[in-house]
Amino acid sequence: MRWVGFAILVYVVMLLQTTVGKLLTFAFESVGVIGPDLSAIVAVFLALRVRELNDVVIAAWVLGLGVDLGSAGGAGEMTVVGPMSLAYVLAVAAVFRMREAFFRDRIMTQAILALVFCLLAHGTWVTAQSLLGRADTSWSDYGATLRQAAALACYTGVLMPLGYRLLLKCERWFVAVQAGRARRGRMMR
């Protein structure tokens, strides 16, 4: 990984998540407000393109920390920082292990892996927030929040192929060595 380029990418993604991401949200009566998780798109891209698991896990932890800090409560509200970081690490490790079973440049592969990533990450986060929250959470509230997380996962999965193509154009700025089998000619250069 090229960490300076990755740090700039994280900053840009967090900026886009808090500005453009708000424009991409939809409100449904049955589910609530859903919007895409742009950080998840970057995490899945890295899980598909980076060779080393350690680099992918550290990058996912940083992205999850950015999501935790970006979703902090308002003045006077308590926010638990850390569950999304750990959820991103768990989800990206699962996607990294599954990537060998798929063709990474296929649109359906990207969408399905983004869906799986978001279901794991946001499902873990919703469960942790429900368990660690100060207020008592009923099963119906927990179920409604899980439905909202599933809708967010579907929405992010739909946007993943577009995000993959955009990130592929600037991959050389933050990915040093791509995943896959190395060729002798490329390794000698």
Regions found by a protein language model. Name each.
Residues M1-R189:
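Terminal, non-globular segments
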